[in-house]
Amino acid sequence: MKKLVTLTLILSSFLVFSQTTKEFVDNVVNEVESNSKLEQLAHELFDVIGPRLVGTPQMKQAHDWAIKKYESWGIEAYNHEWGKWRGWERGVTHVDLIEPRLRTLVGRQLAWSPSTGKKGLQAEVTKIPLVENKDQFSEWLETVKGKFVLVSQKEITGRTDSQWEEYATEESFEKMKKTRDELTDQWYNSLRNTGYGYRDINSAIEDAGAVGLISSRWSKAFGANKVFSAGTEKIPNVDLNLEDYTMLYRLVENNQKPVIKVIATSKEHGDVPTFNTIGMIKGVEKPEEYVMLSAHFDSWDGGQGTTDNGTGSIVMLEAMRILKKLYPNPKRTIMVGHWGSEEQGLNGSRAFVEDYPEIVDNIQALFNQDNGTGRVVDLSGSGFLHSYDY
């Protein structure tokens, strides 16, 4: 039901000559309320297939699944191959604190992380120090050989600001924010002093002989980290939950010389083809003019691939299903694009524009969703002249 407004707005944009607009909207609402397939689509895509990182078997599985869905509804669909990507498959991640005590830590490898192998790696942990210049950082780099390196800032709290505001005194809340801001400024100033950018500092540590990197990019929400790409070529990069990461950080700060064991397996599959999934309902009066539904199909793979952008993907699937059922002979051709590799630079949709100029030149309207969960609170227009008028 959260997607009812979105579906109605999309579907009511199509002029149906045999019905009034109100009749058509009523039929759409009735179909969504009494025969919605959204929950089943969500289960199959999010729970069974899971996240869809470009280049993984799960991404290809999702493309093929979408085609079968469209074909089962009588909708023409195909995979548009637009290029190659690094083939990679996530395996098991297991992290244990060995010294100064035993504890299993909560973590997962970052996307495209090199594998530790089944036996794993065991080593002491160190951290990036605060430095005043590149020479200090270069001197520290000489100490990292054979160690895991903590490469993220230590957070001073794992509670959200809304919880602090609700339960803390005003004085303690303001003190926490001030301390957090000071530590954050200190951290980023030190990173700049190293002479390396955010993207290449990992490579410098790898080249210095570290056995692995330990990251933690907290999203400012309970239990949720941002898990993106490893940024290494030969050594693993593993994300730890905030509480485990900050515990390790404190152990290093207090010279406890913590030791961890990391098993993070993954498979490399070489270069693999990458796709967009395209579906269409042919127009009967102006088939060479197009109305386009759009949502990127890929995701990062640290979560389920649901919010970004599985929700938009199943909305477009459901919209096409309902259109085929209630409006099987549209005036113009209705197309849907499930784009691959949006997260790496809008690659799939850019490739479609390049490969199909005759379609792009004749698009009359395009509806895209990449909003995540929750109710629709804003409709923005862009790209087409006078689009905001609609």
Which residues does each PLM region occupy?
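Short helix-loop-beta-strand segments that form the rim/entrance of peptidase-like active sites
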Residues: 40, 321-347
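N-terminal capping segment at the start of a domain
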Residues: 22-56, 82, 92, 220-229, ...
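Active-site-adjacent substrate-binding region
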Residues: 183-195, 199-202, 206-207, 212, ...
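Bacterial Sec-dependent N-terminal signal peptides
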Residues: 1-21
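Metal-dependent peptidase/peptidase-like ectodomains
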Residues: 102-104, 118, 123, 142, ...
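Structural recognition of the beta-strand scaffold that forms the well-ordered cores
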Residues: 41-44, 79, 127, 148-152, ...
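Soluble metallo-hydrolase cores and metallopeptidase-like ectodomains found primarily
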Residues: 22-24, 114-138, 222, 227-306, ...
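Noncatalytic luminal/extracellular "stalk/propeptide" segments of secretory-pathway proteins
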Residues: 43, 47-181
